Amino acid sequence: MTQMPDPQNPIRIGTRGSALALAQAHETRDRLMAAHGLAADAFRIVVIKTTGDRVLDRPLKEIGGKGLFTREIEDALLAHEIDIAVHSMKDMPTIQPEGLVIDCYLPREDVRDAFVSAQFAAISELPQGAVVGSSSLRRRAQLAARRPDLKLVEFRGNVQTRLKKLEDGVAVATFLAMAGLTRLGMLHVARGAVEPDEMLPAVAQGCIGVERRADDARTASLLAAISDRDSALRVTAERAFLARLDGSCQTPIAGLAELQGDRLRLRGEILRPDGSEVIAAERVGPAADGAAMGTDLAEELRGRAPADFFDWS
């Protein structure tokens, strides 16, 4: 029988300190409380500052990519300073440190990007040469492919920071994740959602993953009760696609898996950072074969890409 956490021996939940990260940590805690009949004092939220949180004046590609938002948290997990780590799966490297595993995924939120602007209701309404802020290479490349006339500027920081930059006139529009706005109770900020056919989202966008030590059987048992099968199937396919492409924050890659009964539709695309070339394809097959489909889709895109396509610096 699994030993339940209590106030003297709580489950320590590691998280970044932004409002969104804390909302995700609290959602994880609340789901565990409901699944196991536990009180809030059987858990402790542990805030850990990552390199990505500290260095805000340089683009992500200059300071190391996805691991910037996870490394310190994973170090704390390996050092037994926390018991689980709550992550936005779109920020996670495809290779995890030895001794750690993610096999718990919460029900996935809205995967779409949100268009945010005080002046305009949609991308199509942006005037020629309008300034748009984004730190996402994927969004910048997709926007450049569709609207090469727009001026794109770097927009680092959390949701509140980016909204303040918009208010200050640094740009007339930006993009955020619908999932993040939903979790923050800020859906009113979005002028509208951008459909995947128009802007394919980041791999694993909208999905929370919970990381644990591979040898921690008690925690594995607790987390199994809150893991969502559909989210796991979709994210597994998307991350297999990303892994074969060696995807990081330095790589404009988009991917989305959608379940249709026991079938999975997986779409993927790769882009040059300036939007001058987009290569896209999709696969449909048994949901259980998602990882193989992801790898196969990535192989097709790599095969269709010119030799210099991945030489991005």
Swiss-Prot record:
- Could you read off the lineage of the organism from its UniProt record? Bacteria, Pseudomonadati, Pseudomonadota, Alphaproteobacteria, Rhodobacterales
Note, other: The porphobilinogen subunits are added to the dipyrromethane group.
A GO biological process of this protein is: protoporphyrinogen IX biosynthetic process
Gene label: hemC
What this protein is reported to do is described as: Tetrapolymerization of the monopyrrole PBG into the hydroxymethylbilane pre-uroporphyrinogen in several discrete steps.
Name the family the entry cites: Belongs to the HMBS family.
Q: What is this protein called?
A: Porphobilinogen deaminase
Organism in which the protein naturally occurs: Paracoccus denitrificans (strain Pd 1222)
Q: Which GO terms describe its molecular function?
A: hydroxymethylbilane synthase activity
Which GO CC terms are listed, alphabetically? Answer: cytoplasm
